[in-house]
């Protein structure tokens, strides 16, 4: 299985060079464009050049190709958006999430869902009685070089409005759709920044109607029952655990920048972590040895800034008790009964089964009178 469509803000500087002015404006409007990955891989495998994106791979009429012929079909009742991490070229993003989609398809079938990644698959997509989950990707300008960590983080933050525009646009076309975001590594940093900026009203999505405005309301301002994202899966998140916490005991008041976005705009978030993640261990060393040392040097002149502290990664640790109540953590090592490294999440059956279970639960009404128990691999309550 290969994911057919990726939305991306890669190579924007060369976008629309071979099209007329109106088409170019339309392609630039939302901060991302759609790419036919079948055509892109034909280019990449022929040239082995990941640095270029020929005009022929860009979908000029995405409304017809991506939406009318795929995502807007009545049979499609859920959409998964996968977004990758640091040091991932475009073809690498496709490979990783196609592996995940392939594994997830079998797991979801046990729950009577059919995952579809290409409208040309042998599935009756016009049958509205089908219960289809469409899988698309979102790729941001990760440089694909090991030494570009900081520049990738900058690109990651700058890509947040584009991802928000994508989700908002999907919701304008299918108001009742359930949207699940699966982010790996630094992709979680991107999603968390998007949520932070939305809840703080740093920007608004380009496509914004009353229904979406309600989804963007904080719970304490009337947004109790609708959410911008239904389920958010964080695989090996390259996010500081203190960034998702709220500390207000005694004299140590601190609210992490991502706390409110996760609390108010996502119905449930699920963190999958492993203490054997070598990439995140290296990231912790880099932040501790370089970034925090430089920051504390600056603070000799500017005074302390508690927002700029680095402690340990969320992807290496159990979820802190100070995180929002709608965020849950899952120990990937316990789930799989083996050591899980940074790239092992995409096709580990036990992890994928857990994701499928959570998606299934998102579409099942719970009965609160039933007794609860706790999974050994999660702090998530389960029905007996």
UniProtKB/Swiss-Prot annotation:
Gene3D superfamilies per UniProt: alpha/beta hydrolase
UniProt key word Isomerase: no
SUPFAM superfamilies: alpha/beta-Hydrolases (SSF53474)
Pfam families, sorted: DUF900
Keywords assigned: Nitrogen fixation
Keyword Cell cycle: no
Xref: InterPro entries: AB_hydrolase_fold (IPR029058), DUF900_hydrolase (IPR010297)
GO biological process, one term: nitrogen fixation
Xref: PANTHER family: ABC TRANSMEMBRANE TYPE-1 DOMAIN-CONTAINING PROTEIN, TRANSMEMBRANE PROTEIN
Name of protein: Uncharacterized protein alr1448
Species of origin: Nostoc sp. (strain PCC 7120 / SAG 25.82 / UTEX 2576)
